[in-house]
Amino acid sequence: MKLTCVLIVAVLFLTACQLTTAASYARSERQHPDLGSSDQNSKLTKRCLASGETCWRDTSCCSFSCTNNVCF
């Protein structure tokens, strides 16, 4: 019985610690958005390849159609 109570208290304590850490981390992200992932920013600036340009896979073309290394 005592062991069960100790385990329950320990789990509640660890859960509270994780919740406060997650909340402070989210608050920090909002205060400093420029410290976020640069990968996320680079995805916003990538351009797709126009029809007739050389490609290596379908996802790089605007039309998502890459045949014989040419976007269609």
UniProtKB/Swiss-Prot annotation:
Entry note about domains: The presence of a 'disulfide through disulfide knot' structurally defines this protein as a knottin.
Tissue-specific expression: Expressed by the venom duct.
Subcellular location: Secreted
Covalent S-S links between cysteines: C48-C62, C55-C66, C61-C71
Name of the protein this chain belongs to: Conotoxin VnMKLT2-021
Lineage: Eukaryota, Metazoa, Spiralia, Lophotrochozoa, Mollusca
Keywords: Cleavage on pair of basic residues, Disulfide bond, Knottin, Neurotoxin, Secreted, Signal, Toxin
InterPro entries, A to Z: Conotoxin
GO cellular component, one term: extracellular region
Annotated propeptide span(s): 23-45
Signal peptide positions on this chain: 1-22
Pfam families assigned to the protein according to its UniProt record, in alphabetical order: Conotoxin (PF02950)
